[in-house]
Amino acid sequence: MKNPILTLFVLLLYTQINAQEAKYADVNGMKIYYEIHGEGEPLVLLHGFTMSHTMWEGWIEDFSKSYKLIIPDLREHGNSTNPSNEFTHEESAKDIYGLLDLLKIDKFKAIGFSSGGMTLTHMATMDTSRIQAMVLISSTSFFPESCREILRSVNYESVDENWMNNMKKQHPGGEKQIRSLLTQFNNMAYSYDDMNFTNPYLSTIKSPTLIIHGDRDVFFPVDIPVNSYKSIPTSYLWIVPNFGHSSIDKNSIWADAFLIVVNKFFSGEWQ
C-alpha cells in the first residue's frame, strides 16, 4: 500500500522544483518569452542559435537552489517573436538588456552557449558594469572562414535528422520559423561587423569570465578561446578534451565537473 504522506511530500517537492513563472515581455517591438525559476541573486541563461530556453531544463534544479534564473528565448527562437526576421548578436544583446530593465534587474551573472555567449560578449562591452561574472561556452569573438563555410552550407533540406527533430520540438512556428532561422544562420556568413571583437576591444571587458571550449569544435578552433583568454583581463580557460561544438548537458560525462567548476567560479573562489 502506498504511503499517502510520502506521496504528498514527493508531489510537493516536484511542484516546488518545477515551479516557474513563464511570461512575455514587450522589448524592441518584439515579444520576448522568458521563464523565471528559483530565488536569490539573478543568473541569466542564454541558449544557442536554433535552440530555445529548453536547452537549460536539465540544469534548472541545480542552479535554482542558489539563484533566481532568468531564461529567455532569443529573438524569433522558441516562443519569442521577431517581426524584422533579422538577427545579430548585437541586437540580441540589446533585447536581453531590455528584458532585464523591465524586470528591474541591474547586476547579474550569466551563462551563454554559442550565440548566447556571443550575445553576452556584446553585453559585456556595451555596459562593463552590469555583468558580475559570465561563462562563455563554445563561443567566439569572430567567425573564421572555416565557420563561414559551414554557415553558408546549411539549409532546411540538408539539416540532419537529429538537428531537425530538435528544432521542431523547440519552435512552435514549425517549418516557417525554422526556415527563417536557417536563413539568418546563412546570413551570418556574410556579416563582418557583428562578431568582430579585436583584442583591445576584448580587453575592455571588466566582468570575470570563464571560457569553456571543446578542443574539437568545428565552428571555432581552439586558438580563438585561447586568444580571448589572453585578452580578457580577468578570465579563466577550461579546454574540454574530445569535445566538439556543444553545450554540457546533464547526460555529459563532464556534467558533474561543469557544475563544480561553475559554482566555484561564481562564488569568487578563484579571484
Language-model region placement:
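Conserved HGGG/HGGXW glycine-rich cap/lid loop of the alpha/beta-hydrolase fold
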Residues: 30-79
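Active-site nucleophile elbow and catalytic-triad environment of alpha/beta-hydrolase enzymes
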Residues: 184-201
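Conserved loop-alpha-helix segment in the C-terminal half of the alpha/beta-hydrolase fold
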Residues: 213-243, 249, 256
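Catalytic active-site module of serine/aspartate enzymes centered on a nucleophile-bearing elbow/loop
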Residues: 241-271
